[in-house]
């Protein structure tokens, strides 16, 4: 499996909540360099916990890879997530409010020679997310 296909497969696995496939794609020593990752368990268990939480908050969550490219051991993806806040965001103190979201994030992943993802750096457009959820005034 090449690096581009690994990212596509990972997004499908998260969407399907297929955490066995997530374990196949993320290395055992996986490290997430993302805001809030310190609140999660380390490694791929933390990545799976974050995804599970997003499905609780947004049970109708859909993600689309808008852009994806790679060179060497790195891939860069631009992902768009849509959904409806049915479960709230406990980490932000936001209750369920049925507001729709449409938010982007950028992710850089480092792939190992074993074909697995070993590190990810990701940044979501959190200000837009907070505005869409009514937790921050619009600009």
Predicted features, each with a name:
Residues 1-139:
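C-terminal and inter-domain tail/linker signature
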